[in-house]
From Swiss-Prot:
It comes from the Eukaryota. Disulfide bonds join 31-165, 100-258, 144-212, 176-191, 202-227. One of its GO terms (molecular function) is toxin activity. InterPro entries: Peptidase_S1_PA, Peptidase_S1_PA_chymotrypsin, Peptidase_S1A, Trypsin_dom, TRYPSIN_HIS, TRYPSIN_SER. Keywords: Disulfide bond, Glycoprotein, Hemostasis impairing toxin, Hydrolase, Protease, Secreted, Serine protease, Signal, Toxin, Zymogen. Snake venom serine protease that may act in the hemostasis system of the prey. Glycans are attached at residues 105, 172, 213, 255. Its EC number is 3.4.21.-. One of its GO terms (biological process) is proteolysis. PANTHER family: KALLIKREIN-1 (PTHR24271:SF47), KALLIKREIN-RELATED (PTHR24271). This is Snake venom serine protease KN6.
Length: 260
């Protein structure tokens, strides 16, 4: 029994720098049913597997992480409880998906972003409403809200029925560099978390929003598999740096390139 536990712990340590392939909100509480009208649940059509979350940015477009992609995606809007859906829940499928050059051309620190065009627009309702894109970048020290249906444990996959939310802080990029030495000197990501540990996104939360001082600023991308671990914050794709790309794609300019 002791040997099994030791081996399990070694496996967790080996995964400690793994990408949050489909990323929990560790240390959070159930979200208020009215605070996440823009939050989208993503599923693989073929397998039915939950892939993570996205953010509705207008009636026809969803923004999420590139690594949440599957060949055909089902998107659910107005969802809180998976078992007892809201009456105004709407379901769509992906019509087109847009990436920075290629759906494989992303790294932990660059281009982990995907725009999904829906097969038809969603309608605003009591539990569905788009979230605006940012007009300015966030400031270090900002209080940021994270949310998602990700696992509630970093040692086993326990996906909740309802989304969980937590408040974390926007940190200096150097805090992520200290935790993850492979990070470059600069990247188009945000570093966010609680340095003392205890609150974090985790497996199943990928693609969900980072909302700082009420503004959509980041997309949950990756971090330590030991979710909520001391001095191991999360990395979030910086939405503001990709505004031109996002707006150009939506306007029909599909030849636009992402920022370097």
């Amino acid at each position: 029994m002791v040997l099994i536990r030791v081996l399990a712990n070694l496996l967790i340590l080996q995964l400690s720098y793994a990408q949050k392939s489909s990323e929990l909100v560790i240390g959070g509480d159930e979200c208020n049913i009215n605070e996440h009208r823009f939050l989208v649940a993503l599923y693989d059509v073929s397998s039915g597997d939950f892939r993570g979350s996205g953010t509705l940015i207008n009636p026809e477009w969803v923004l999420t992480a590139a690594h949440c992609e599957t060949e055909e995606m089902k998107l659910q809007f107005g969802l809180h409880s998976k078992r007892v859906p809201n009456k105004d829940k709407q379901t769509r499928v992906s019509k087109e998906k847009f990436f920075c050059e290629s759906n494989k051309n992303y790294t932990k620190w660059n281009k982990d972003i995907m725009l999904i065009k829906l097969n038809r627009p969603v309608k605003n309702s009591a539990h569905i409403e788009p979230l605006s894109l940012p007009s300015s970048p966030p400031s270090v020290g900002s209080v940021c809200r994270i949310m998602g249906w990700g696992t509630l444990s970093d040692t086993e996959m326990i996906l909740p029925d309802v989304p969980h939310c937590a408040n974390i802080n926007l940190l200096n990029y150097s805090d992520c560099q200290a935790a993850y030495p492979e990070l470059p000197a600069k990247s188009r990501t945000l570093c966010a978390g609680i340095l003392e540990g205890g609150k974090d996104t985790c497996s199943g939360d990928s693609g969900g929003p980072l909302i700082c001082n009420g503004t959509f600023q980041g997309i949950a991308s990756w971090g330590s598999t030991l979710c909520g671990y001391v001095r191991e914050p999360g990395s979030y794709t910086k939405v503001f740096d990709h505004l031109d790309w996002i707006q150009s794609i939506i306007a029909g300019n599909t030849n636009v390139t992402c920022p370097l």
